[in-house]
Design a protein with these regions (language model features):
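Cofactor-binding beta-sheet edge motifs in enzyme active sites
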Residues: 1-167
Length: 167
């Protein structure tokens, strides 16, 4: 069954979503961008005695073409930024020999509500240039991608220490 499912749901060149596709002729001769592009930034503070990093401000901008459901699109972006914050600050698989010691939700460190910044700015760019309905693009979770690098750069700017690896 796996081959049948993969073949049915695969996205060959020109296919946008589901079973529809864009013909490569006329104004659609080049496959258009269908996914969300995003930019993120953050400000952090570092406790010089403990080394604890706290995120003070977070900003995200996502180009979604058109947010058919703006609350959902905003939730996707802020949730993705929070996941990226976890990657940049907390998440780490810890082993003793070959045994994973933090393999449960009780032991694996994820962001808590208390870790979230007090100031969040979220913007959706909606210029209706997507190939989806009414100019929508495939929005969701693009703000995840750069968060760990944002945190590393903010730490370098704050205390002059370059982080080159996520926890």
């Amino acid at each position: 069954w796996s081959e049948v499912i993969c073949k049915f749901y695969a996205l060959p060149d020109g296919e946008v979503i589901g079973r529809a596709y864009i013909r490569k002729s006329g104004k659609f001769s080049a496959l258009p961008v269908f996914w969300e592009a995003a930019a993120t930034g953050c400000e952090i503070s570092v406790d010089e005695e403990t080394g604890k990093i706290s995120m003070e401000k977070l900003a995200t901008v996502g180009d979604v073409g058109l947010a058919i459901n703006p609350a959902l699109a905003e939730g996707q972006d802020i949730g993705a930024a929070t996941m990226g914050m976890g990657i940049g600050l907390f998440e780490e698989l810890i082993y003793e020999g070959s045994q994973l010691v933090n393999g449960s939700i009780l032991d694996y460190r994820l962001p808590r509500f208390s870790d979230l910044p007090r100031h969040v700015e979220l913007h959706l760019v909606q210029n209706q240039d997507g190939v989806g309905p009414y100019g929508a693009k495939g929005g969701g979770e693009a703000s995840l991608n750069a968060m760990a690098a944002n945190i590393a750069n903010a730490v370098d700017q704050a205390v002059g220490v370059r982080i080159r690896k996520a926890p």
